[in-house]
């Protein structure tokens, strides 16, 4: 069974011709027309020319197979062949007349085979053959008439064969021949080779590879070049044979060769190729074969570089023929230009360095080319230091881009320099403005700005204050507050109608600003820099908070004294509404036994802030402290209309007078009911009651000002009025005020809102703020310096962020505080 299976498989392989046909690649045209058939390297390789290929094929490639012979029967059906490639086969026999049917064949490649000779019968019928390649064969004999059937041959390659001799008439009939490769053959330099050497001198081989032609025998001539002498001696085969075979028979010119050269202009133009046969052995052919200028065309090399060359072409009779300058590259050529003048200067560019080029002057007639003279030269090699001319604009583009980039760098550098210089000037101006602002905050706006700067520049000389203002606070309740000062303070704070900037508004309100003692003013430009500014701002903030806290304490005590009276006071005979509030004694034990009329109001000062504490102070004292609560009632000549209870927390120990210093810190006492009573203006009535024990009962009318309805932080000056208002108007101020969005913006300006984002005094600094500063500071700072810095930022943000009427309200608030302090 196994044998039957193998036999069946073998029969299938033999009976299927499609398996072989599939190995050829066909490029077909219309109607089954085949342009190219590639059957090279077939597996299995072809041993005969395949017959399944369409007969219309033009280019047939059968290279690298195992063809043994070329027969007429295998080629006669391919009548349209123009190219036949039989390279690298095992062809050793070509039948005579095998190519009779190939009348259109132009290229025949038979290289790398086993041919031993070339005869006329092997090449018969190929009248249009132009290129014949039979290199690397075993050819020993080429008959003199082998190429007589191929008059159109342009290139013949017989290199690397076994040719020892050639007849002088072998190539004489090939008028169009331009390339004849004979290198690699073992020539026998005897007298029978002299005829071939005579033809070789006349022939202008395009490749000019004369140095590869040398003698192999006899022994005394081994290694001699056939034509070109060696550099170290002038001996070559043709000179030796010329002297040795002088009496020998010279080869007669073939009948098919044109008539001898004649200088007459009426000769047949195409009868010769421009060489005089009398000069065949007169000179050795140089590297560039040129003739006399008077005899025929000449070509000379004028200049050569590594990428260009300049040729000079001289034509005695330019109009006798059509002359063309042709460039040859091995077996191919290309026309460069048509020569129409007697002397042409041709410039050749785009050449490669260290490359050999061949240019010939050729005449054309009847579609045939006749070489007159050729020139072969080699371009120069690149030398370090020589600059090759650029054939592209790459360098130009690169230089343009680099120039643009360099220009952009210069422009950006100039812009950066200008911006940096401008920024430095702005920072310098800003520093001057900050110092000027600090000086104005310290000395007030009454002093001229120029004099302040001039005074600040004088180190060691304290500036002279134009107005000495005191911020003393009455420590005893029994003191009488002069009404004239209060009236002046009240009339001295009109609301500014026009809008202005921060400096203008604050300069206008500088008359009510607080002055610092002259001995407490440090030097401005003493090298300490920002430390002095922060310290100055912090002290100013401390002073403002001291005044605010004192005024708030006074208001709370006055409100408590008004609301604490049962009824009927010194103003009982009046029809106006009056509030009677009495102050509490210092000792909490005596508060329950003492009469309201005998209460003495303590000092305005609050308990001092202890710096050793690490937590923010609470503004409300605990209910466990010794506090006595008083109730305030509304009394009039009639019945009681309404009553509202207010609570007031009073510390159990009186505040010492000695604590009222500029660096002391004060704590506001918040009302548990968050009553706006501590922010309402107090208007004194016509008469006031008196109390014993050094205490005093103040009969005051409460009149809401227009500031109260606008901003919670507004604290206008006291208004003293002689007239009396209605009861409804006097009681309406007791209603709790609501805070609008606009009011809450500047609520930080009041010390009671100590839980805001920024503290207005160092005493309101909290632990969380301290931790934030600890997180971002690069080095450890002093605790007091951090507190002063926070205070300075708070004051700056509160005042500088205010605009227009908001700024006026802030200034009015401080004016009211100042007026209350003066009272």
Swiss-Prot record:
Inhibits phosphatase activity of protein phosphatase 1 (PP1) complexes. Residues 249-294, 590-624 are annotated as: Disordered. The keyword Methyltransferase does not apply. InterPro entries: ELFN_Fn3 (IPR055106), Leu-rich_rpt (IPR001611), Leu-rich_rpt_typical-subtyp (IPR003591), LRR_dom_sf (IPR032675), LRR_TM_domain-containing (IPR050541). Keywords: Glycoprotein, Leucine-rich repeat, Membrane, Phosphoprotein, Protein phosphatase inhibitor, Repeat, Signal, Transmembrane, Transmembrane helix. This is Protein phosphatase 1 regulatory subunit 29. GO terms for biological process: chemical synaptic transmission; establishment of protein localization; gene expression; synaptic membrane adhesion. It comes from the Eukaryota. It comes from Mus musculus.
């Amino acid at each position: 069974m196994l044998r039957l299976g193998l036999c069946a498989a073998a029969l299938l392989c033999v009976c299927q011709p499609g398996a072989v046909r599939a190995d050829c690649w066909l490029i077909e045209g219309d109607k089954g027309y085949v342009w190219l058939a590639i059957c090279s390297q077939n597996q299995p390789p072809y041993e005969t020319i395949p017959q399944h290929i369409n007969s219309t094929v033009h280019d047939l490639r059968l290279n690298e197979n195992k063809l043994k012979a070329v027969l007429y029967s295998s080629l006669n059906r391919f009548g349209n062949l123009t190219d036949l490639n039989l390279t690298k086969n095992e062809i050793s026999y070509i039948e005579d007349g095998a190519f009779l049917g190939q009348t259109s064949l132009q290229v025949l490649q038979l290289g790398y085979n086993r041919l031993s000779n070339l005869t006329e019968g092997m090449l018969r019928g190929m009248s249009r053959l132009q290129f014949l390649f039979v290199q690397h064969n075993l050819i020993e004999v080429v008959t003199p008439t082998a190429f007589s059937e191929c008059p159109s041959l342009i290139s013949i390659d017989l290199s690397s064969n076994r040719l020892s001799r050639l007849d002088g008439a072998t190539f004489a009939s090939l008028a169009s021949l331009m390339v004849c490769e004979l290198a690699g053959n073992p020539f026998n330099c005897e007298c029978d080779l002299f005829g071939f050497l005579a033809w070789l001198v006349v022939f202008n081989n395009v490749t000019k590879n004369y140095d590869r032609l040398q003698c192999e025998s006899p022994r005394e001539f081994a290694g001699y070049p056939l034509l070109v002498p060696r550099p170290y001696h002038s001996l070559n085969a043709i000179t030796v044979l010329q002297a040795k075979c002088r009496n020998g028979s010279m080869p007669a010119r073939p009948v098919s060769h044109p008539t001898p050269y004649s200088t007459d202009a009426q000769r047949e133009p195409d009868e010769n190729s421009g060489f005089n046969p009398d000069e065949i052995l007169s000179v050795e052919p140089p590297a560039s074969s040129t003739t006399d200028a008077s005899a025929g065309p000449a070509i000379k090399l004028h200049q050569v570089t590594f990428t260009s060359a300049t040729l000079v072409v001289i034509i005695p009779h330019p109009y006798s023929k059509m002359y063309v300058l042709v460039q040859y590259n091995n077996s191919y050529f290309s026309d460069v230009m048509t020569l129409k003048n007697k002397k042409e200067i041709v410039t050749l560019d785009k050449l490669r360095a260290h490359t050999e080029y061949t240019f010939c002057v050729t005449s054309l007639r009847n579609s045939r080319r006749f070489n007159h003279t050729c020139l072969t030269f080699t371009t120069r090699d690149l030398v370090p230091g020589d600059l090759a001319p650029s054939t592209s604009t790459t360098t130009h583009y690169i230089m343009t881009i680099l120039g643009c980039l360099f220009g952009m760098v210069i422009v950006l550098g100039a812009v950066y320099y200008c911006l940096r210089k401008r920024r430095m000037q702005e920072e310098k101006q800003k520093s001057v403005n900050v110092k000027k602002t600090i000086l104005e905050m310290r000395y007030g706006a009454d002093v001229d700005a120029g004099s302040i700067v001039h005074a600040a520049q004088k180190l060691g000389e304290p500036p002279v204050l134009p107005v000495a203002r005191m911020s003393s606070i009455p420590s005893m309740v029994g003191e009488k507050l002069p009404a004239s000062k209060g009236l002046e303070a009240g009339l001295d704070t009109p609301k500014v109608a026009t809008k202005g900037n921060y400096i203008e508004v604050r300069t206008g309100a500088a008359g009510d600003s607080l002055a610092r003692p002259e001995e407490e003013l440090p030097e401005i430009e003493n090298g300490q820099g920002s430390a002095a500014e922060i310290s100055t701002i912090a002290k100013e903030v401390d002073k403002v908070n001291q005044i605010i806290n004192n005024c708030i304490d006074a208001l709370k005590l006055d409100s408590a004294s008004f609301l604490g009276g049962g009824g009927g006071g010194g103003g009982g005979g009046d029809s106006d509404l009056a509030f009677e509030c009495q102050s509490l004694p210092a000792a909490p034990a005596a508060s329950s036994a003492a009469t309201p009329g005998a209460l003495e109001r303590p000092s305005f000062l609050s308990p001092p802030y202890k710096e050793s504490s690490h937590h923010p102070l609470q503004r409300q004292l605990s209910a466990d402290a010794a506090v006595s609560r008083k109730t305030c009632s509304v009394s009039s000549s009639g019945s009681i209309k309404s009553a509202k209870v207010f609570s007031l927390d009073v510390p159990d120990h009186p505040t010492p007078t000695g604590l009222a210093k500029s660096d002391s810190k004060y704590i506001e006492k918040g009302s548990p009911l968050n009553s706006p009573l501590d922010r309402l203006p107090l208007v004194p009535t016509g008469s006031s009651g008196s109390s014993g024990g050094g205490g005093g009962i103040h009969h005051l009318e409460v009149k809401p000002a227009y500031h109260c309805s606008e901003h919670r932080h507004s604290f206008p000056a006291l208004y003293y009025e002689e007239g009396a208002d209605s009861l409804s108007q006097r009681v309406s101020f007791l209603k709790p005020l609501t805070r609008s969005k606009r009011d809450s913006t500047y609520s930080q300006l009041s010390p009671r809102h100590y839980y805001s984002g920024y503290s207005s005094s160092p005493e309101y600094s909290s632990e969380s703020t301290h931790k934030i500063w600890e997180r971002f500071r690069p080095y450890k700072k002093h605790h007091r310096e951090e507190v002063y810095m926070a205070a300075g930022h708070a004051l700056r943000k509160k005042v500088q962020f205010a605009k227009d009427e908001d700024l006026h309200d802030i200034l009015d608030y401080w004016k009211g505080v100042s007026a209350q302090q003066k009272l």
